[in-house]
Amino acid sequence: MKVRSSVKPICEKCKIIKRKGAIRVICENPKHKQRQG
């Protein structure tokens, strides 16, 4: 899980989701998981 000021999808399978007011990227590849904070 990376915490970044700007979250971007890295590959085609990355999905941007808003959860509890935080923007997250979820993906099949665990290295692509990100959240904004």
From Swiss-Prot:
- Assigned keywords, A-Z: Ribonucleoprotein, Ribosomal protein
Q: Which residues form a coiled coil?
A: none
Its domain of life?
A: Bacteria
> Which PROSITE patterns does UniProt cross-reference here?
RIBOSOMAL_L36
Pfam families for this protein: Ribosomal_L36
Query: Which Gene Ontology cellular component terms are annotated?
Result: cytoplasm; ribonucleoprotein complex; ribosome
Q: Name one GO molecular function term.
A: structural constituent of ribosome
Biological process (GO), any one: translation
**UniProt cross-references to NCBIfam families, sorted A to Z:** rpmJ_bact (TIGR01022)
Family affiliation: Belongs to the bacterial ribosomal protein bL36 family.
Name of the protein this chain belongs to: Large ribosomal subunit protein bL36
